[in-house]
Amino acid sequence: GWAGRGGAAGGPPAAVPGQGNAQGAPQAPAVPPGEWRPWRFRMSNDVWGTPVVSSGRLYVTSFEVHALDVATGRRQFKTRDVAWTMAVSGGRIHGSDGPSLYALDAADGSEHWRTGVDGWIYSLRADAGTVVTGTRGGGVQVWDAAAGRLRWERGGAQTEFETPESGPSVVDGVVYFHGGGRLHALDATSGAEHWSYPTGEGGAMPTRPVVADGAVYVTVGNRVLALDARSGAERWRFDAPAVMFAPPAYVPGPGVTGGGVYVADYLGTVYALDPADGRDRWRVATEQRQSVEPVLVAGGSVMLGAGGALYTLDAVSGTPKWRFAAQGEIVGSPVVADGRVHFGSKDHCLYTVDASGGQLRWKLETGGEITGSPVVSEGVVYASSKDRCVYALNAVKGTEAATRRA
């Protein structure tokens, strides 16, 4: 059974010093040398999605993209245009306001290039010099990230689920997209098709594929497929009793050490599949979940938010370890760092619990639901809330100050 933990007795909400404000509020007092203090930055508009940390900056989407200094929380710049979608890669911010695509310097916000698009961009991914966009009506465009030049475009992508989670993606120089009941794999440079595979699930929500160790893993409807990355040939398939909204999570290695393919269906049942043949090693029921986030596998444990609780299972055996109950639905994906698990909830709180036993270490009560997933970098956890704020907290002690890392 589950070792139950709860967040109701987590103590009073923590106070966070205000470090910045979109309306020009006074700056916080100077921080003593060698000390880092938690900070909060309040936007003038709603904050959405998951923040991105890169090269000493925190990038947050709040209509525009805002670049904040991770040490102080002071805003370095913001974009002049709306960014409905954003990707940070190769020292650049790639964003779209819908009908246009642009690239900015991630250090100072200066514009590198901008181009119009024939359609409305709903999905944007960037990787290794390539930008891939999906447009309403089944369009797929592939761009050179350096110059903004259109390399190639295709039609015929699926239109039933035009969401960022189901849009086209790029991995290791290959562009993947769903269309016509098939998963297509095309060369990111030339657009030549490497292969396509019939997924056979018309009308079912497809997910972005996971590519690892020469295989492509993808969920479509209630099916998990493992395909050869070079040829597209099917290695195995697994049919679950219920539909899956989230992509699989892959862990290298044999099952006896926790390796495998891990998926969860919308009823909250977690499956551990053998990566060699797709055999169902174990399955464990939790609570119904609507999340499009994959389960998290870290430190020999499988973690997932389901309903209003965070569940942790042993990756090898599926044995329940612990369950932490929040006061609202878990949002996004948890993140594990230095023996702690950080996650947000619709109950307005950001939680930090012990990874081994699920004991509450600290929580922060904000003025709204947590949005996206928290991010941890160099001992700091960052999270956004529907109270229009982004928070930077000491990952160990929450709102307490910390010694700066050299």
Language model region names:
Residues D69-T72, D105-D108, D144-G148, D187-S190, ...:
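Short loop/turn segments that connect beta-strands within beta-propeller blades
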Residues R37-P38, R74-F77, S110-W113, R149-W152, ...:
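A structural motif specific to WD40 beta-propellers
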Residues S44-V65, T79-Y102, A106, T115-Q141, ...:
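Repeat-blade elements of multi-bladed beta-propeller folds
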Residues G24-S44:
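A short helix->beta-strand "capping" segment at the edge of beta-propeller domains
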Residues G1-V31, T403-A406:
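Sequence/structural signature of beta-propeller modules
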Residues G6, G20, Q76, V142, ...:
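Positively charged, low-complexity intrinsically disordered regions
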Residues G20, P320, F324, L393-T399:
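Generic cytosolic/nucleocytoplasmic N-terminal low-complexity/intrinsically disordered segments
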